Amino acid sequence: MAGNRSFRDYVADQFYNEIFAAIQGFTADNYDDLDLRLYRVQNIGSIELSDIEVKYVSVNDLPDMKIEFDVAVEAELEVREADYHYDESEFCKQWFMLKCSGDLNCNLDNFTISSVTEYTSKNRQSRPMSDSLVPIINKEQLESVATDFLRRYYPEALIKPTAVEPQVLAEKMGLVVEMREITKDFSVFGQIYFHDCDAEFYDEDSDEMVLTHVDARTIFVDPKAYFLRNLGSVNNTIVHECVHWGLHRKAFELERLYNSSVTRIKCQVVGGI
């Protein structure tokens, strides 16, 4: 998967027209109540939206692939004087906050703006996500996040202290684990596929990469990890890929909004064997 993508940039580009129309409608209906800094216009007769700039997007994680997010926008407005004796107009800038939501399972095709208000302050999200749609987890939250993960996928570990079996965890998450050589040089020892695709794997018999159909929700672990590393490395790889599925699917789907051909996250070997 490529480097971190910006959700703010995506929203600003893809939903510019929707955001513009929402603010235009709000200012037209509420211009008498807007707290605008005007110097020449005394009584607002009309107001027209000239341009907008998305300043930041604050995202809150929701169940499944849904998200809700606040979009802070700086708008440039042209304001005209109501008194026809004065042919006055001036430009001013005002910030607005838009509450939005969408589902990444449908590529945000159901993008919705539920409200528009004048900006006052940044809202605190209960389950905040970064601009690349990765959950923001503070050190103090690690235990609660781990507990929630186990409650959803491995609840018996919370009832009686027990080691988490990676293969069982994967099955409980609806994932399939397959042992297969991935690259010739063992530069990648684990991969998880989020979407069906045709992918290349190293074939030792022919000593070349071969194209193979792969189903979504499949984890591949290179069996050389058993011999060149150890069983713990294999187990850690499986758990690592499970965590990708549980916590990073939204970041992955953001990447696909930019590049629809992306299908997997891979774990590379760092350093020597």
Regions from the language model: what does each represent?
Residues 2-273:
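Active-site hotspot residues in diverse enzymes, especially metal/ion-binding acidic/histidine motifs
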